[in-house]
Swiss-Prot record:
This is Rab GDP dissociation inhibitor beta. Interacts with RHOH. Interacts with the GDP-bound inactive forms of RAB3A, RAB3B, RAB3C, RAB5A, RAB5B, RAB5C, RAB8A, RAB8B, RAB10, RAB12, RAB35, and RAB43; binds RAB3D to a lesser extent. Interacts with DZIP1; this interaction negatively regulates the interaction of GDI2 with GDP-bound RAB8A. The modification N6-acetyllysine is found at K112, K269. It is a peripheral membrane protein. GO terms for cellular component: cytosol; Golgi apparatus; membrane. It comes from Sus scrofa (Pig). It is found in: Cytoplasm; Membrane; Golgi apparatus, trans-Golgi network. Keywords: Acetylation, Cytoplasm, Golgi apparatus, GTPase activation, Membrane, Phosphoprotein. The keyword Cytoplasm applies. The lineage of its organism: Eukaryota, Metazoa, Chordata, Craniata, Vertebrata. It comes from the Eukaryota. The modification Phosphoserine is found at S130, S382. Pfam families: GDI. Belongs to the Rab GDI family. The modification N-acetylmethionine is found at M1.
Amino acid sequence: MNEEYDVIVLGTGLTECILSGIMSVNGKKVLHMDRNPYYGGESASITPLEDLYKRFNIPGAPPASMGRGRDWNVDLIPKFLMANGQLVKMLLFTEVTRYLDFKVTEGSFVYKGGKIYKVPSTEAEALASSLMGLFEKRRFRKFLVYVANFDENDPRTFEGVDPKKTAMREVYKKFDLGQDVIDFTGHALALYRTDDYLDQPCCETINRIKLYSESLARYGKSPYLYPLYGLGELPQGFARLSAIYGGTYMLNKPIEEIIVQNGKVIGVKSEGEIARCKQLICDPSYVKDRVEKVGQVIRVICILSHPIKNTSDANSCQIIIPQNQVNRKSDIYVCMISSAHNVAAQGKYIAIASTTVETKEPEKEIRPALELLKPIEQKFVSISDLLVPKDLGTDSQIFISRTYDATTHFETTCGDIKDIYKRMTGSEFDFEEMKRKKNDIYGED
């Protein structure tokens, strides 16, 4: 270990593993360590089930009705991949897809007036949906056609809207959309967690709705994908990529000290040995003095023996509870997967509810989601701090990832990856850069 590296990475969360993979593909010498004996950090999938009980201090062993412990891979964070989103692009460009199998999530649902409705995924479904009345549907369709044709580089598609100046609120007004439809569009399609976006320039929102529509168009049932065997497979896929390009991996490595000289990182000490480096990437848990708390997320993992009611017995789905519906500032999310994804014993379902904490009683805040899941066989509650780096890391060359937020997709995580990449290299993140070199040594399939 007493060697000189270009980059040392601490923690094997998704952000760290993707950056480690990209740096290795770009010819950097990378050492990647984790204090845990497993991959994934905060974004791990826990197996066997007994380990989940231990992690959440639940007394006793899982009951026999839960089946074999090793049939379970339980994600600590609830996320899906947008079929046309940035993470899927990263997987395709790096060919990490060869190590993974995905399934399309069966449906996306939205909560309105105490009930859940399917988010329409085809024009026929939209016309039949009881989410909105007939005239509202016509106006909404006009709005969707406008969004589909919109191109921020072609003023002919603007129809009097200035993408950099016109607020999204004004665009909704232009199409005469009602409050329910605005809630549904902003939260179930554009996937905003709060309503702050209404007063921002509309370009970002329109592009988010386009991403949703394009993702949906790829597979038809919903815009979301989920990897077999759980989200923990994602960091492992990128770790394999890094290893193929000469990256060195060490799990179960206690990190004793990050060594800084004249304000700049020069190495990492583990088990009495020092590995030197020019740059360091890590998650917040390795540098508690360099991050600050900006909020909290509550997540409740629920084991069920039944699909969620009113989802047409879907074996996987997402439910969004828009904040307006439950008098909150932030949305509540539910992600549900099942034995169909090799993450649970036969006939069992895992539903994870999450939201940004707004009060002193987070468990009360998440109750509307838990009501939809009843009866719940076993639940595991966690409240995590949202941590962000105090500085950009350009002086110390210590680049710290953000903790995973309450959203149910990876678009914000990909934004963080691109941001760190730019700070580390001084150049914009380019998907082409991630392409495997044509004459490289391919990993075994």
